[in-house]
């Protein structure tokens, strides 16, 4: 929609004019949301990588969510490599979280590292089996096992 794009560009100019210290950060977040909403995965990925390079996150949830979005939407190997880094970091910051391990395993698999993907997914499954109530029980376990079966094909 050209009119919406024009309006969005005008809003970004207005944000910059405010002189806010974090205007560029706000615009970066808005750009990611804009491209995602438009279904423009190529520009979303480029914007997200530039944003994360400029404003690195130490929040494992942010890192995992960005990584999972890349798993679902991005095909460029260089961009996926960035998501693998973010996902690895999320797992370093929050050890033994099955959902974070699943994201990491999924990205490894999509990037062609099948052996390590299987190892990470098996680790996630093991954690859920030890404490099923802490991680959503059977539904998560089935999801993880289903993805592991895909990895092993």
Where are the predicted features?
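Oxidative protein folding and maturation machinery
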Residues: 1-153
């Amino acid at each position: 929609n050209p009119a919406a794009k024009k309006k969005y560009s005008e809003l970004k100019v207005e944000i910059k004019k405010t002189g806010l210290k974090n205007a560029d950060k706000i615009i970066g977040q808005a750009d990611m949301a804009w491209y995602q909403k438009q279904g423009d995965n190529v520009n979303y990925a480029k914007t997200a990588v530039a944003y994360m390079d400029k404003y690195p996150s130490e929040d494992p949830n942010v890192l995992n969510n960005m990584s999972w979005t890349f798993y679902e939407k991005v095909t460029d190997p260089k961009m996926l490599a960035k998501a693998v880094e973010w996902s690895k970091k999320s797992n370093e910051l929050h050890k033994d979280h099955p959902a974070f391990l699943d994201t990491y395993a999924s990205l490894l698999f999509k990037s062609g590292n099948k052996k390590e993907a299987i190892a990470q997914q098996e680790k996630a499954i093991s954690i859920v089996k030890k404490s099923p109530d802490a991680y959503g029980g059977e539904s998560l376990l089935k999801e993880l096992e289903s993805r592991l079966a895909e990895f092993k094909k």
